[in-house]
A protein has these predicted regions:
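Active-site beta-strand/loop signature of hydrolases that rely on acidic residues for catalysis
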Residues: 6-7, 23-41, 104, 133-155, ...
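Surface-exposed cleft-lining segments at the edges of enzyme active sites
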Residues: 84-85, 110-126, 162-166
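Conserved beta strand-loop-helix elements of the APE1-like EEP
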Residues: 63-78, 197, 209-229
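Structured beta-strand-rich core segments of catalytic domains in phosphoester-bond hydrolases
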Residues: 37, 44-112
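Active-site beta-strand termini and strand-to-loop segments that position acidic
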Residues: 73, 97-100, 224-225, 250-254
């Protein structure tokens, strides 16, 4: 099973930049997106269907904001929209699909700020999401949690880390949450295969950051420990450009 996760920063914008042609060539089994920034009737599900994908969409109530979706060539046994928590579900942040004994979760973690209401909301989301995943793993032990985490975990995951310590996305408490996430039995699949630096998945639009590779690695496929032995490969597809993020891919057996 090949799973690609991609923060599109607006699906309609990404389509105008050739998303469908790339998708037809890449042909992931499961395509998870974040920041669709679209309502269901604004997403071209007919073209997705022509490409072989069934669409499962979770949009934010606020138009042009947030939103996640799973497009799948494999028929899922079950799809669950949201976390059963209106505080987060109104923003379209989580969608889940079950395939046999494997569960795929697509998440768009809030971007937050260094302080204030957005900071509080992000930290509350992180704690509630961790609890929700722990409970889900009792029922579904083999899980993939892919998406935009809006946190760079370690200094190797961010350009010029010393300048970023007080910046949202690299705050000590955010990174500590990822430490606890990992300690709970979650595996950063990219780091199973690549321990090198300067591997990023997001670049600011400002000052030619992408051309200079001044970026952050904030898009991940984490898997639960029991699924580790079935991970075949994990990559960052940095050459693919439809967004300020790039796609990340994962291959798992069965």
């Amino acid at each position: 099973m090949k799973i690609i996760s991609y923060n599109l920063n607006g699906i309609r914008s990404a389509i105008s930049k050739g998303l469908f042609d790339w998708l037809a060539e890449e042909q992931p089994d499961v395509f998870c997106i974040q920041e669709s920034k679209a309502q269901p009737d604004q997403i071209d599900v007919m073209t997705m269907q022509e490409l072989g994908y069934t669409s499962y969409i979770h949009s934010a109530e606020k138009k042009g904001y947030s939103g996640v979706a799973i497009f799948t060539r494999i028929q899922p046994d079950r799809v669950v929209v949201g976390m059963n928590n209106p505080k987060y579900d109104c923003q379209g942040r989580v969608i889940r699909a079950d395939y046999g004994d494997v569960t795929v979760i697509c998440v768009y973690i809030p971007s937050g700020e260094a302080e204030g209401p957005k900071y509080e909301y992000k930290m509350e989301f992180l704690e509630d999401f961790l609890v929700w995943i722990k409970e889900l793993r009792k029922e579904r032990p083999n899980i993939v949690v892919c998406g935009d985490y809006n946190i760079a975990h370690k200094p190797i995951d961010i350009n010029n880390w010393k300048r970023q310590v007080g910046v949202s996305g690299f705050l000590p408490e955010e990174r500590e949450w990822l430490d606890r996430w990992e300690a709970s039995g979650m595996v950063d699949t990219f780091r199973m295969f690549d321990q090198s630096g300067e591997k990023y998945s997001w670049w600011s639009f400002r000052a030619g950051s992408r051309a200079r590779n001044v970026g952050w690695r904030i898009d991940y496929h984490w898997v639960s420990e029991p699924l580790r032995e079935r991970v075949v490969d994990a990559k960052i597809l940095a050459e693919v450009v439809h967004s300020d993020h790039c796609p990340v891919s994962l291959e798992v057996r069965g």
